[in-house]
C-alpha cells in the first residue's frame, strides 16, 4: 500500500490486490493441524476482503495452490481452502489472481471447476504467470501471460483474450527476475509497431480487460 502511494505521487493510477500466498497454508501445516491451519489462513483472507470492501484494494491475490508437488491430503485441503476463499471474494465483488502449478488445459479445467463450485465468475479469475498451455483452452478464466516474445506472438496470432505481466520480484538477489518492470510496455509497443498485435488487440490487453477485471484504478 505504501508503494502504491508512491506510484500515485509519480502520476500513475494503481489497482492493489492482497491475500495470503497459498504457500503460507503449507507453512501453517508445519505447526497446526489442517483445521487450525485453514482457519488461520481464511481469517487472513477475510481481512483482505475487508480491505476490498473499504475500497483500499480491488481484489485478492495471489490465492491458489502450491506450484510444487505435495501429498494428496494437502492438495485436497488447498483446493478446499481455495474454493472457500473464492466464495469470500465473491461476497465483496473482488477479482482474484491465481498462483498455481503451470497452466495446461487440464489444470485450467480443474481451476474452472473449483470456480464453478464457489459460484465465482471465471472471467474475473486471473491465471497469473500464464503460458501457451493456459491460454490454449482457458475454460473461461482470464489469463495473464508472461510477456515473452513467444507468448505475445502466439496469443495475438490466435486472437486469444489475455493480459500481460512480468512477475517482477524486486529482489536484490535476483535483479530483473522474472522480467524487468519495463518489459510489458517495451515489448507491447514493439509488437504493435511490427504488426504482431493490432491496435484493437493492444487496447484490449492494456485497457479493456484490466478495466473489466479490476474495475477501478485509483
Regions found by a protein language model. Give the residues of each.
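Charged helix-capping and loop-helix junction motifs
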Residues: 1, 37-45, 74-84, 181-184
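Metal-cofactor-binding active-site regions of metalloenzymes
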Residues: 2-52, 61
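Hydrophobic faces of well-ordered beta-strands that scaffold small-molecule active sites
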Residues: 14-20, 58-63, 96-98, 124-128, ...
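Active-site-proximal loop/turn and secondary-structure-junction residues that shape catalytic pockets
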Residues: 20-24, 64-67, 102-104, 131-132, ...
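Active-site gating loops and adjacent loop-to-helix segments of metal-dependent hydrolytic enzymes
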Residues: 21-37, 56, 70, 169, ...
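Divalent metal-binding pocket/active-site signature
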Residues: 31, 49-131
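Mid-to-C-terminal alpha-helical segments outside catalytic/metal-binding sites
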Residues: 87, 185-218
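Short acidic/histidine-rich active-site segments
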Residues: 99, 160-178
Amino acid at each position: 500500500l505504501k508503494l502504491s502511494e508512491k506510484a500515485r505521487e509519480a502520476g500513475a493510477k494503481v489497482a492493489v490486490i492482497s491475500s495470503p500466498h497459498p504457500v503460507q497454508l503449507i507453512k501453517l501445516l508445519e505447526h497446526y493441524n489442517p483445521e487450525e491451519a485453514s482457519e488461520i489462513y481464511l481469517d487472513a483472507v477475510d481481512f483482505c476482503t475487508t480491505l476490498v470492501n473499504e475500497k483500499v484494494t480491488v481484489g485478492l491475490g495471489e490465492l491458489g495452490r502450491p506450484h510444487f508437488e505435495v501429498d494428496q491430503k494437502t492438495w485436497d485441503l488447498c483446493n478446499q481452502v481455495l474454493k472457500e476463499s473464492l466464495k469470500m471474494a465473491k461476497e465483496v465483488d473482488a477479482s482474484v489472481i491465481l498462483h498455481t502449478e503451470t497452466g495446461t488445459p487440464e489444470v485450467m479445467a480443474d481451476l474452472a471447476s473449483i470456480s464453478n463450485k464457489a459460484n465465482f465468475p471465471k472471467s474475473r479469475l486471473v491465471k497469473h504467470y500464464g503460458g501457451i498451455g493456459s491460454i490454449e483452452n482457458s475454460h473461461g478464466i482470464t489469463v495473464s501471460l508472461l510477456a515473452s516474445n513467444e507468448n505475445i506472438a502466439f496469443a495475438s496470432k490466435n486472437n486469444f483474450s489475455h493480459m500481460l505481466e512480468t512477475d517482477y520480484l524486486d529482489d536484490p538477489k535476483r535483479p530483473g527476475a522474472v522480467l524487468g518492470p519495463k518489459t510489458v510496455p517495451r515489448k507491447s509497443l514493439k509488437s504493435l509497431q511490427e504488426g504482431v498485435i493490432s491496435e484493437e488487440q493492444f487496447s484490449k490487453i492494456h485497457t479493456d480487460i484490466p478495466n473489466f477485471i479490476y474495475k477501478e484504478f485509483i
